[in-house]
Amino acid sequence: MGAYRYMQELYRKKQSDVMRYLLRIRVWQYRQLTKLHRSPRPTRPDKARRLGYRAKQGFVIYRIRVRRGGRKRPVPKGCTYGKPKSHGVNQLKPYRGLQSIAEERVGRRLGGLRVLNSYWIAQDASYKYFEVILIDTHHSAIRRDPKINWICKHVHKHRELRGLTSAGKSSRGIGKGYRYSQTIGGSRRAAWKRKNREHMHRKR
């Protein structure tokens, strides 16, 4: 096995003594830093490379912290208007995963870069920490690389805001295989409409 394979096996056993100690030290270190900061290199190089990262010019890693749990609806004095169904304030859960939310926040802050992918690095009682792989599409090393220059096209601007990253597709229920039959046709709504609509074929 290569070195990256050993690193991958380490992260599969997060309850081992080594990983518990390592993650505890890391989350303490991350708590001292700002919630969004640039990382000089990926914390998990094996995972980053599998998601498309390469140690070359134009690739950037940013680390972000996201508060765990649900969100309280930001309404004054709990006054929500409308039907009782929409009166909830406290126990509301996000429709998307925290990883997708983390990608969105990084993408909004760093609008000149493109979000390629992201991965989990640590968590504690209050926060989850992710590293996001970003790409500088104006760098000549990226534009000349046929393996990655697809992301330079304008259609890939703000992929993270449209659910086109891996975490975003996971939140939308999109994938391949029998487990994802509920989104055949592009989305849950499209699949529902196709299954529940009666087709009246016109006889000619």
UniProtKB/Swiss-Prot annotation:
Keyword Transcription regulation recorded: no
Region (Disordered): 185-204
PROSITE patterns per record: RIBOSOMAL_L15E
Residue ranges crossing the lipid bilayer per the database entry: none
Segments of skewed composition (Basic residues): 190-204
Family matches, as SUPFAM superfamilies: Ribosomal proteins S24e, L23 and L15e (SSF54189)
Lineage top rank: taxon: Eukaryota
GO molecular function, one term: RNA binding
GO BP annotations, alphabetical order: cytoplasmic translation
Entry-linked SMART domains: Ribosomal_L15e (SM01384)
Entry GO CC: cytosolic large ribosomal subunit; cytosolic ribosome
UniProt keyword terms in alphabetical order: Ribonucleoprotein, Ribosomal protein
Membership in a protein family: Belongs to the eukaryotic ribosomal protein eL15 family.
Name this polypeptide is given: Large ribosomal subunit protein eL15
Organism, as annotated: Drosophila melanogaster
Gene behind this protein: RpL15
